[in-house]
């Protein structure tokens, strides 16, 4: 939504949030929202809120009004991405020391299903059309990172010849990805943990990836 933004901040040790709408209007969001995502068309929003030891998926209009709980899950560390009008993706918290998963919630059927996983250090970045996922995972055999593209329709994974985190990438349409790629990953680095803690200075180079041909160039 171009005319509005969701703002979150820590106040009195409580995570608070609000919507800044247009030039002057503000709508307060519930406290302690765990994750937030706009719908692809910007007309709705979704967020996760903890209640009775379950994570509630709540959908509201773009002003935060008319909230409705549509799904509950015990995956309390999940983060969401509204990847298509029909599908909201759930990603477990990434750690190179734990297996991660990606799930999808189908709005029309209320079905909740696994999309990908397990994978240590699993991170994801969905394509704008919600059909492909850029994935990064811990390469436990050498302590680095392996990066690839997963086609959700064909259920096929294609490895890329770059090693980077999805946090360092952005889709440019549905066919191109631009990434900052670490020049070196020291031994014993735990990713993405060290990166998320600000303890990994990667010294990146910029790489452009053709998502159709799975080829990259500086």
Language-model regions: role of each:
Residues 10-12, 50-51, 62-63, 108, ...:
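Solvent-exposed coil/turn segments that connect beta secondary-structure elements
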Residues 213-218:
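Surface-exposed loop and turn segments in beta-propeller and other repeat-based domains
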